[in-house]
């Protein structure tokens, strides 16, 4: 449909008009870069028109701001648009309109042919508008018209303002002014076409500048256009569906359609590159201000107007979705964790089952291979293989016992081959089989810890050996020691060293280990919490004891059961005692104390003697060992428990507990308080106390069963004393104590010298044959 527009003075294509708001009789019309205009609808003539009233303006020197009642312009002149007639069939002034339109058409055709080649392509690039509301919204100044063109247009408007007010007809019905808001990234080449004046010289100058600037920034804006194309297209389509109106085919002009009361216009944002003087927009204005504001990207637009809203909206929506998804995610995470734990548990259980089955099968195979062997040399090899297997996997001992390995080993021990007998004794001790005790009952030797004060215990043992005329390892069935007592137990029980040699070695160890410069020791104390060199002590132990395992000492038939006690400090909250044994417990018998027989002898001594402050703690496997005296400085009770595990049906005959001397001061502290040093000293003394265990055992055991030898010293001698005169003083005080308790020593020697009765010997023989042939000897081969 063609529209005839009667133009009085000029045609002004409105581009960035934001709103036209007013009342029924006196309405206000707001245009870009224009002051406030009052207009009213005339009911005198059939051709309805609007007439301007007195121009009222408020000026500002900087940017333009528009609000509900005012409009500011950087110019000093008013801008007035007079439209005489908007009709499709008005005959008045038709000739004049045709002349003006022909000129406009020819000009646009020439420009479009010069740039694009045809008019249709130019029209497709013109800014399009979309009807959104019934009020034309106000926009801020965008700087799309040069100052020179604005002044010329204002002069022309003032000149013909009166004429346009008298001649301009307008339809009687109320017009609904509609606004279109488009994104800044959708600008086309001729989006300023709606603002071209009728002075074609100026228009051509304006268009040429705009075209040049457009192609200069085309590369810069191409990426932005591609990114925003799809979003703007979807927004335009959504608005079309909501409002139910078609897009106007002629953007940039005011058109009146028959049967419609809407006047459509375009709200096209200006180009930032075309106009250099772009004015800032107030942050309090509507969203259209920011959509029309030139910007180089979406981030600037969002940061300028809705920068505070978008993060909040995004956060709110995200938080709502997270709140909804949080329980599900939590349940899923919990279920996943449970499933993972269950899978891990089942996997570990399956691995344990497979490992246990494989261990049992391996044990059975070794036992059967040993039973099929007849060659003595090959038997030694088979026995050693089974021994190594049981050392690595102690849980296989039960399977070996079920396969009746003990009777076969006892029969092998009858063969006159020392190497084979030694190998058999070792594996029997590892399985937990024990020979009968030496005397009428179990004889236990327990030695306390105390450093170099162990020479006092040596004096007591010297007296016992003198009275019994037997070495120490033949007098006792079980020897247990802590710290320095463990050293004596190993030297006497495992290495069978004479007492004189032990005393000499004791003095040498004291001079080699406990000779340390005070300054160097203090530095080491602050660094490793050890005053003395622990590495030197380890090297001495390796040289003296070698690399033999504890269980290998069971090869000697005269070797008693020996144990060294240490303290594990990294298992749980409370420290725990650990027993280094040269034997194993029978399957099904569990000791109250941790321990093992697969360790080396020097490792046992090193762990048991790691006194805090003197030597560094010793890491062995996954355990951290310290001095056993921290828990059990008197290991008599532990020795009794271990013996009951080895010989459950044999009574106790004698327990000899040797101390390293004690010092009792007559000085009494004040009644009111004690010093911090005294408090700490009391804690240490209570931890290393030996007399409380003595009092308990002395009251519980039968008479003439428990004997304690611990002399009282006249001087408090430290455990790291290495001076010979002090060691001689300790030795002398030990001898004096023995002289005062000579009757007690004779009683102990008498008990230790008793032999087994004939009935006990017969019982031992019957038990041996029963174990050897799996039945009574009367029904077996003797």
Curated annotation (Swiss-Prot):
Top-level EC class: hydrolase
Variation of activity with pH: Optimum pH is 8.0.
Means of activity regulation: Calcium-independent phospholipase. Inhibited by (E)-6-bromomethylene-3-1-naphthalenyl-2H-tetrahydropyran-2-one (BEL). The activity toward 1-hexadecanoyl-2-(5Z,8Z,11Z,14Z-eicosatetraenoyl)-sn-glycero-3-phosphocholine is stimulated by cardiolipin.
Annotated region described as Disordered, given as residue ranges: 219-275, 317-343
UniProt keyword annotation of Calcium present: no
Domain of life: Eukaryota
Pathway entry: Phospholipid metabolism
MF annotations from Gene Ontology: ATP binding; calcium-independent phospholipase A2 activity; lysophospholipase activity; phospholipase A1 activity
Annotated catalytic residues: 483, 627
Every PNPLA domain range: 445-640
Entry's Gene Ontology cellular component terms: endoplasmic reticulum membrane; membrane; mitochondrial membrane; mitochondrion; peroxisomal membrane; peroxisome
Main location: endoplasmic reticulum
Subcellular location: Endoplasmic reticulum membrane; Mitochondrion membrane; Peroxisome membrane
Membrane topology: Single-pass membrane protein
Chain's role: Calcium-independent and membrane-bound phospholipase, that catalyzes the esterolytic cleavage of fatty acids from glycerophospholipids to yield free fatty acids and lysophospholipids, hence regulating membrane physical properties and the release of lipid second messengers and growth factors. Hydrolyzes phosphatidylethanolamine, phosphatidylcholine and probably phosphatidylinositol with a possible preference for the former.
PANTHER family in the record: CALCIUM-INDEPENDENT PHOSPHOLIPASE A2-GAMMA (PTHR24185:SF1)
Disease: Mitochondrial myopathy with lactic acidosis: An autosomal recessive disorder characterized by progressive muscle weakness, hypotonia, seizures, poor weight gain, lactic acidosis, and elevated serum pyruvate concentration. Some patients manifest growth failure and moderate neural deafness.
Protein name: Calcium-independent phospholipase A2-gamma
Species of the source: Homo sapiens
């Amino acid at each position: 449909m063609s529209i005839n527009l009667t133009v009085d003075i000029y045609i002004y294509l409105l581009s960035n008009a934001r709103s036209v708001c007013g009342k029924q009789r006196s309405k206000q019309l707001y245009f870009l870069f224009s002051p406030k205009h009052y207009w009213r609808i005339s009911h005198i003539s059939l051709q309805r028109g609007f007439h301007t009233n007195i121009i009222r303006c408020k000026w500002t020197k900087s940017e333009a701001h528009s609000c509900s009642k005012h409009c500011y312009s950087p110019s000093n002149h008013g801008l007035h648009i007079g439209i005489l007639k908007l009709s499709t069939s008005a005959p008045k002034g038709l000739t004049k309109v045709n002349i003006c339109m022909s000129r406009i058409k020819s000009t646009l055709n020439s420009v479009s042919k010069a740039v694009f080649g045809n008019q249709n392509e130019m029209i497709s690039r013109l800014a399009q508008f979309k009807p959104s509301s019934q009020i034309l919204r106000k926009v801020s100044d965008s700087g799309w018209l040069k100052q020179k063109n604005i002044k010329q247009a204002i002069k022309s408007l003032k000149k013909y303002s009166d004429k346009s007010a008298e001649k301009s007809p307008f339809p009687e019905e109320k017009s609904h002014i509609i606004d279109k808001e488009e994104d800044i990234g959708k600008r086309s080449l001729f989006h300023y076409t709606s603002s071209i004046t009728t002075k074609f010289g100026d228009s051509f100058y304006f268009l040429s500048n705009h075209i040049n600037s457009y192609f200069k920034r085309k590369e810069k804006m191409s990426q932005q256009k591609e990114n925003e194309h799809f979003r703007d297209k979807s927004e335009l389509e959504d608005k079309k569906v909501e409002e139910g109106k078609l897009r106007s085919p002629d953007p940039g002009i005011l058109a009146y359609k028959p049967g419609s009361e809407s006047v459509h216009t375009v709200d096209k944002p200006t180009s930032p590159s075309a106009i250099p003087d772009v004015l800032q927009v107030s942050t309090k204005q509507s969203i259209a201000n920011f959509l029309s504001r030139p910007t180089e990207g979406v981030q600037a637009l969002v940061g300028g107007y809705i920068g505070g809203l978008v993060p909040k909206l995004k956060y709110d929506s995200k938080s709502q979705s997270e709140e909804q998804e949080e329980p599900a995610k939590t349940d899923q995470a919990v279920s996943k964790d449970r499933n993972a734990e269950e899978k891990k548990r089942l996997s570990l259980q399956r691995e344990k089952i497979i490992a246990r089955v494989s261990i049992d099968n391996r044990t059975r195979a070794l036992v059967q291979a040993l039973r099929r062997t007849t060659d003595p040399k090959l038997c030694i090899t088979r026995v050693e293989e089974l021994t190594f297997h049981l050392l690595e996997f102690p849980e296989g001992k039960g399977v070996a016992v079920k396969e009746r390995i003990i009777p076969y080993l006892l029969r092998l021990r009858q063969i006159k081959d020392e190497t084979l007998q030694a190998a058999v004794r070792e594996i029997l001790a590892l399985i937990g089989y024990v020979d009968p005790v030496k005397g009428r009952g179990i004889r236990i030797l327990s030695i306390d810890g105390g450093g170099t004060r162990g020479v006092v215990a040596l004096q007591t043992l010297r007296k016992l050996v003198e009275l019994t005329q037997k070495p120490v390892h033949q007098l006792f069935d079980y020897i247990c020691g802590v710290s320095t007592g463990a050293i004596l137990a190993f030297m006497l029980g495992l290495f069978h060293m004479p007492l004189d040699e032990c005393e000499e070695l004791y003095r040498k160890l004291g001079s080699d280990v406990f000779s340390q410069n005070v300054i160097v020791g203090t530095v080491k104390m602050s660094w490793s919490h050890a005053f003395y060199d622990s590495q030197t002590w380890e090297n001495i132990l390796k040289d003296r004891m070698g690399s033999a395992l504890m269980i290998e000492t069971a090869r000697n038939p005269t070797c008693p059961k020996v144990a060294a006690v240490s303290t594990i400090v990294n298992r749980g909250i409370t420290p725990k005692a650990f027993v280094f044994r040269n034997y194993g417990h029978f399957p099904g018998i569990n000791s109250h104390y941790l321990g093992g027989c697969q360790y080396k002898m020097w490792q046992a001594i090193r762990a048991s003697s790691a006194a805090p402050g003197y030597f560094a703690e010793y890491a062995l496997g996954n355990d951290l060992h310290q001095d056993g005296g921290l828990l059990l400085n008197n290991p008599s009770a532990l020795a009794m428990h271990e013996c009951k595990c080895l010989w459950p049906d044999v009574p106790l005959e004698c327990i000899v507990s040797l101390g390293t001397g004690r010092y009792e001061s007559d000085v009494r502290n004040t009644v009111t308080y004690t010093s911090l040093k005294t408090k700490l000293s009391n804690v240490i003394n209570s931890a290393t106390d030996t007399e409380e265990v003595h009092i308990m055992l002395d009251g519980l055991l039968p008479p003439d069963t428990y004997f304690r030898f611990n002399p009282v010293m006249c001087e408090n001698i430290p455990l790291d004393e290495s001076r010979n005169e002090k060691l001689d003083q300790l030795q002398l005080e030990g001898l004096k104590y023995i002289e005062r308790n000579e009757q007690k020593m004779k009683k102990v020697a008498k008990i230790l010298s008793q032999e087994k009765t004939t009935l006990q010997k017969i019982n031992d023989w019957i038990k041996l044959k029963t174990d050897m042939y799996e039945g009574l000897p009367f029904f077996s081969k003797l």
